[in-house]
Each structure stands twice: as structure tokens, then as C-alpha cells.
Amino acid sequence: MFIMSSISHAQLGWNDAGTPVSDQFDDVYFSNVNGLAETRYVFLEQNHLPQRWHNDDQRRFVIAETGFGTGLNFLAVWQAFVAFREANPDAKLKELHFISFEKYPLSKSDLIQAHQAWPELAQFAQKLHKHYPLAIPECQRIVLNDGLVTLDLWFGDIKDCLPKVATQEQGLVDAWFLDGFAPSKNPEMWNQNLFAGMAKLAKHGCTCATFTSAGFVRRGLIDAGFAMKKVKGFGTKREMIAGSLSEKVPYTNIAPEFRFEATHGLQEVAIIGGGIASATLATTLARRGVAVTLYCADEKPAQGASGNRQGAVYPLLSGDHNAVSRVFAPAFLFARQWIEQAAEQINFDHDWCGVTQLMWDEKATDKLKSMLEGNFPTQLVHGLSAEQTNQQVGVPVDKASVHYPLGGWLSPAELTQGLIHLLEQQGKLTAHYQTPIDALTWQPETQLWQLRSGDTLMSHQCVVIASGHQFDSLSQTAELPLGKVKGQVSHIPTTETLSKINSVLCYDGYMTPVSQQNGYHCIGASYDRQHLDATFDPQAQHENAQKLIHCLPEQTWPLEVDVSGNQSRQGVRCVSRDHLPFVGNVGEFSKITEQYRDLAQQHQAEPIALYPQLYALVGLGSRGLSSAPLMAELLASQMCGDPMPLGVDLLEQLHPSRMWVRKLRKGKALTQKV
């Protein structure tokens, strides 16, 4: 599958009417006369919106568009949907999902300038500006209006992106906006592959409208399965075409060995856990109207690996754009957006001060220089000379580095506890503390899971295991090939010099700037696979300080790091060998072992055996703060049958059964642990 490495911004000019014009395609982005009126006529009216929304019994309505451009179509339909919801608060349709593809996204400054033309859309445009993503390939998800509206921006050529949109057999899209520059200006886009791809993603009865009346477009859409007709064009334009998918041919691009299932009619869910994975998932499901019950073995949230005072937030990138990099780049941008939205509702210690990774030895230098060859946007990551690093960090290090200007740190404990307490106050979550779940049993007659805690039994429609390193306490997830690594973080008092550190510093360890709340830094963290208890480790405490001294031997200020107070915190990370989380339906180990024992010889794999209505969100490792929000969004989308925020090939890389499948494909037998 083709992997895009970088995205170019649109090159714009502005004509006498103040309309943006593409230098690449020599065409206007919208009508010189009244672009907003044209959008409403061509795309809303001809797709029968908002009338269709009144009788729609779905929870979420999905629109897909072939060219985002200035976002005019999106802003117009967002405005219409808000008006619909305000006028019809009891309607079954609750959410709007807008998927758009764009090869040359506008820069943020050009987007803001273009939006000056429509003051009536200003309140929506400003929200879009706030979270408009960097130009990173593939899907960038933006959640707006507390989940009322979701925007998926697929950056890249539509011919490469469209096949990556994960699609179940019944289809995904309710209405297509076939937009973009005129076929005469951009003939490469308007072709039969596009029309066929639109039909593959469409549901039965999906409508379609486009401003053009070109015969080859109409014939191509008809050949793809759409019933198209000419209708009166907007303003002085004589004709345009509109129609609907008359016959849906079942299609899926999801491999049977990596299939996933929604929980039909999902109303309530039990989450087993209590850390950042549980808190982000509970928040994301609550936005979708799902009632959440949390079962936590501890006396309050964030007592495990999510309980640290300060944790760094920055992406894990690779110059070759491997799967880890392709997951973490959008995950980090989504985390930034998600955390900023959380900060509008709850208080937690955090600072977007940037993260600086030092080239402290030859190995680190080679690794970081290789990463910079990935041609990432400079706002995401860029290199710094030794002198620039000194200025950025605030204390002398005299090492070159890479800097993540959008990174920073936050308090995982405060964020996790704040999110869960907010949901409790809102009546969206019921928490049961000191309630470890001992066993799960599927009840076929009721189609419910029975949970046992001691002598107490509870029943739930759906269950998510998000219990970190305790994943193996339940038989259904005990065989997942995950590891456990203890980490100790040291809390050190600041000094006059240490207080000048103004960026998270990463080397063979990490050190945060001082927290203004408590006057302490966090420095860490140890990696111990042998001892998984929560007891203080004096050797780890000493090594946390020594790592900094070892990496910066010429500097004197690291000697001010004082760990002698033995203030620290211990936690156990849940880690995967490939550095990616396990997100999705839980597979039945014993059945998979049997059904796939000759997978290497199978031409077409049979659908993988999954436990009904059982999911996992585990293996977040050391970068959980950067990945948890998007992984929670991905899992909630999967559970609810919504469009997915990552490409179908990346979903395979996150599937909880992936390592079993890989091994069986090689003709190797599964042992108890892969």
C-alpha cells in the first residue's frame, strides 16, 4: 500500500473579487458571486439536506467530500446541522460526521483569510481554525461541539486515501459531495476509479451531487451504480447532476483475519481499569450517549501507571514513516486538541513548553538525524544546533537536538481523576472503586456479559478491558503478548538554575520543567522487568540522577539534581514489542489457534474468532499520554460503528490479535505467549 511521506500546501492567489484562486489548478475555490449560496443549493439542497435528517433513525449521519478546499461546504453543513439539532432536540439523529479529502490543504493563514468572506459562519470557522491540523499525511480527526460534529481531513491524493478508509460491507457514507476544481482543470481526479471508490464507501440509497454537468462524470457515476440525473444549475449555470446509489454491492476492505465488530444498539458499557485509557474512553463514549460503568480495583482513579505528577507529551516519529510513526503523528495532534478541550472543563497541571530530545551520544545522534529525514512539518519537529538548544532549553547543554514545539507535559493523575469526576458529576459515569473484576462470563441467552467481583455479580451489554498491566488477570485477555515494565520516577526540588529549564528535556532519561504547583521536577524513569512491585528502589533513584550527569558530563548544573529526599513514584507499564497499543475486539485465543493453524496455506482466511461485545484498550506503554485520546476515539468509533480515524492498514497494526496472526502466517505454532 502506498505511503505518503509529506504534504504540500496549496499555493493561492486572490482575484479582484477577493476570491482565492489555486495557482496549481488555475481555478477559483468558490463562486465569485455567492459561494455560500451555491454550496447550499448544489450540495445541501440536492442531497435533500436538512430534510432527510428529520426522518433519519441513525445516531450519526456521514457525509464524504472529494475536495476540502476552504472548508466552505463543511462550514455550511455544520451550521445547518446545529440549527437542525436546536430545532429538533429529540430527533434520533444526534451527530454529523464529515469526511473530506484534500491533496493540497490551505495553510491556516490562508484558511482564515478565505473565511473572512462569510461573517455568518464566523462562529464555526473560528472553532475550525483553533484545531486545524498540521499538514501530515492521511487522516486527521477533529472533534467539534463536544462531539456533535466530527471532521476527518484526509490529506493526500484521493486515489491513495480513498482505499484506506475502512469500510464494512454495508457501506459508510450517506451523502457524497463531489466537489473540487473543474474536470477541465483537474482531469487527474475525475476518473472511473474515483466514481467506483465513491460507490464502495456508499450505503444503499446514498445521495450524490456535483456542480458539474460533464457527460463523462454522469456516465461514470452511472457505471459505478449511481442513478444520476441533470437538474438546474446554480445561478447562471444551466445544469448540474445529482442522484443516489440505486443498488449497493457489498464491499469491504477489512481483511477477515483483522475484522472488527461494532456492538449493535450500544447503550451501556463496563470499563475495567482506572487510568488514562479508561478516562479517555469513558469521555469519548459519553459524548456518543453511551452510559459508562467503571470498575476500578483501587480506592480512586490513577493509582497505577497513570498516577505520575508530570508526563511528557510528544510523538514517536520515524524518518521512514513506519506504522508507529503513522499512528503517533496524528495521535499526538489529536491529543493536543483533546487535552486543550479537556482543559476548558477541568483543572489539571500542564504546560505546552515544548519537548527537546538531545543528541547526547553517537547512537542518539544517528537516530534523531534519521528521523529528521522524514520531512515532517517544522511545527511538528525540527533540528536545533547546540547553540539553539541552549537557548531553547534555558540551561547550557552544548548538544544539538530535535525540538517538538507543540509538545509539553501534563499531570496524568490530575487529568485522569478530573475526567472521571466530571463524568460522575454529569451523571454519565458510575464508578465502583475497590472492585476488582475476577472473572467475565458471556451469557448467550441474555447476550450480556456477567462480571464477578468476589461474591457480587453484575451484567453489562459490553465490556472493555483497560486495566493496563493487569490485563492477564482475566482469562479472555491473559494470552495477549504484552509485557510489564516497572518504572520509578524521582521527584526533585528545584534550584535557581534548575528552575530555568523551560522545555521537557529528553536524553537517556527525561526531566520536566518545574511544576509551579509544587516546586518540584520529575526525572526518570527506570525500566525494570524483574521487580513489578510498588516498593521504593534506591538504586533506581540513584540512576535517575546519574543518567543526566552521564549524558551531560561537561555541565555542572546536573549535579544540583538532588534525589536524596527519596521522593518518588512507582508504576508498571503495559508494553508491546512493536511499540503500538492493542485496540479493538478481543480474539478467542483457543479458537484462533485452531482455525488458523494452517493459515500459511490458506488462500483466503476465514473471519477471525472474536468474543462478542468484548474489547481491549491496553499496551499504551511509555507514550500513553500521546496516544490514549486517539486510541480511545478509535475504539469508541469501532464499538459504535462510526468511521475510523486511521487507515485500514493501520487498524491491522493495532488489532489485539495481530501478533498471533503474524506468527500463524509464518507457519509457526502459537505457544501460550507469542
Swiss-Prot record:
Region described as FAD-dependent cmnm(5)s(2)U34 oxidoreductase: 272-674
Underlying gene: mnmC
Source organism (scientific name): Vibrio cholerae serotype O1 (strain ATCC 39315 / El Tor Inaba N16961)
Location relative to the cell: Cytoplasm
Reactions the enzyme catalyzes: 5-aminomethyl-2-thiouridine(34) in tRNA + S-adenosyl-L-methionine = 5-methylaminomethyl-2-thiouridine(34) in tRNA + S-adenosyl-L-homocysteine + H(+)
EC id: 2.1.1.61, 1.5.-.-
Lineage: Bacteria, Pseudomonadati, Pseudomonadota, Gammaproteobacteria, Vibrionales
Entry superkingdom: Bacteria
Names of the cofactor(s): FAD
Function: Catalyzes the last two steps in the biosynthesis of 5-methylaminomethyl-2-thiouridine (mnm(5)s(2)U) at the wobble position (U34) in tRNA. Catalyzes the FAD-dependent demodification of cmnm(5)s(2)U34 to nm(5)s(2)U34, followed by the transfer of a methyl group from S-adenosyl-L-methionine to nm(5)s(2)U34, to form mnm(5)s(2)U34.
GO molecular function list: flavin adenine dinucleotide binding; oxidoreductase activity, acting on the CH-NH group of donors; tRNA (5-methylaminomethyl-2-thiouridylate)(34)-methyltransferase activity
Family membership: In the N-terminal section; belongs to the methyltransferase superfamily. tRNA (mnm(5)s(2)U34)-methyltransferase family. In the C-terminal section; belongs to the DAO family.
The name this protein goes by in its record: tRNA 5-methylaminomethyl-2-thiouridine biosynthesis bifunctional protein MnmC
Region (tRNA (mnm(5)s(2)U34)-methyltransferase) residue spans: 1-246
InterPro entries per record: FAD-dep_OxRdtase (IPR006076), FAD/NAD-bd_sf (IPR036188), MnmC-like_methylTransf (IPR008471), SAM-dependent_MTases_sf (IPR029063), tRNA_MAMT_biosynth_bifunc_MnmC (IPR023032), tRNA_MNMC2 (IPR047785), tRNA_S-uridine_synth_MnmC_C (IPR017610)
Cross-referenced Gene3D superfamilies: D-Amino Acid Oxidase, subunit A, domain 2 (3.30.9.10), FAD/NAD(P)-binding domain (3.50.50.60), Vaccinia Virus protein VP39 (3.40.50.150)
